[in-house]
Amino acid sequence: MVTVLIAGGGTGGHVFPMIAVGDAVRAAARDEEARVVYVGTARGIEVRVMGERGDNLELLHVLPLRGGGLSGFVRGAARAGSVLPEARRLVERLDARVALSLGGYAGGPVSLAARSLGVPVAILEPNSVLGLSNRLLAPIVDRAYVAFPETARALRPSTVRLFGVPLRRAFARAPYAPREGALRLLVLGGSQGALALNDVVPRAIARGRERGADLEVVHQTGRDREAAVRALYAELGLAGRARVVPFIDDVAEALAAADVVIARAGASTLAELCAVGRPSILIPYPFAADNHQLRNAQSLERASAAVAIAQGDATELRLADEIARLAAAPALRARMADAAAAFATRDAAARVAADLLELARAPRHRALRFPTLGGRAARAGEAQRGAVTNQAAPLGAGLGWEEAG
């Protein structure tokens, strides 16, 4: 049996590509039995999504280094000293043959642990800019699966595979035919919703209708925000025109039914709307790491597949203008849909899966010891696992490793 570890999670932008690759690995293995084990944290949506699917999910006890201020950083850094040995025990127990990281809080520790044991390591970066975890892992990986050509410039050429964003099999091209009746809008703020979209989009739709546009909307609000958004639509006189839901389980079906999508610009969301082939108005999340959502959105805008509006410029008036313009221009919407579909890579999951299985069958590397961690937490981890060492030589982007004898 070949065991493939797929680590990441936290948001739908990680979880759904993880699922897509895992499903493709099992399909590609054919006569060779393949076990897919996902690794995430208790803080992410993977617990619910993968739990409902009955997937094999392991959880690491990881604290974030970003977003918690100085105290949060200190707690997360201290915890890192014990997370690496925890991840190493996990890799050993499962006898993993290859590890794939999508970044995030689980991806880094699992990849470092796998590499320390000689297990081949791959990263998958769906965004146009490498995330922090993948950027740090880049010097030690065997493969780097990317979706944007510009991402490759930050990676060793021999490792790069330009495969696109892995998607679940449900996402397929849906013919785009402008039709009579109301323009159907789909609002996606990501798996956790988007406060800014929850406020400005209903107001923009109300203004668009004042200008004569016939509009209907399905609005994904994120959990715990449904009631407030539903109340806002009612206040604006749109209760009969809006279907408000906290989370859309079948996004592929919702995209196929939409005429225009209003969304953030996470890579998975963009890959999904391109696979189905839908025009979009994109409002990138301005606080995404390295502002990667803005670059994602600009890539689609350059391809004439989307309208990109920075959040600071996304007033209800500006958004109403764009909605009304697209509502009045069915030919433009059709051209944008074709451009989006041309941007899609529908076989990414299968290509990643085939390559991962090839890595899994390859001979293992020579084992490496953990990088220097420093501090009390690292010394505690060293006491737990003799493999942890503070004697290390620098490699690449600050990662220190020592070959095990």
Swiss-Prot record:
Pathway: Cell wall biogenesis; peptidoglycan biosynthesis. One of its GO terms (cellular component) is plasma membrane. Pfam families: Glyco_tran_28_C, Glyco_transf_28. The keyword Cell cycle applies. PANTHER family: GLYCOSYLTRANSFERASE (PTHR21015:SF22), UDP-N-ACETYLGLUCOSAMINE--N-ACETYLMURAMYL-(PENTAPEPTIDE) PYROPHOSPHORYL-UNDECAPRENOL N-ACETYLGLUCOSAMINE TRANSFERASE 1 (PTHR21015). Its EC number is 2.4.1.227. GO terms for molecular function: UDP-N-acetyl-D-glucosamine:N-acetylmuramoyl-L-alanyl-D-glutamyl-meso-2,6-diaminopimelyl-D-alanyl-D-alanine-diphosphoundecaprenol 4-beta-N-acetylglucosaminlytransferase activity; undecaprenyldiphospho-muramoylpentapeptide beta-N-acetylglucosaminyltransferase activity. GO terms for biological process: carbohydrate metabolic process; cell division; cell wall organization; lipid glycosylation; peptidoglycan biosynthetic process; regulation of cell shape. Cell wall formation. Catalyzes the transfer of a GlcNAc subunit on undecaprenyl-pyrophosphoryl-MurNAc-pentapeptide (lipid intermediate I) to form undecaprenyl-pyrophosphoryl-MurNAc-(pentapeptide)GlcNAc (lipid intermediate II). This is UDP-N-acetylglucosamine--N-acetylmuramyl-(pentapeptide) pyrophosphoryl-undecaprenol N-acetylglucosamine transferase. It is an enzyme of class 2 (transferase). It comes from Sorangium cellulosum (strain So ce56) (Polyangium cellulosum (strain So ce56)). The keyword Manganese does not apply.
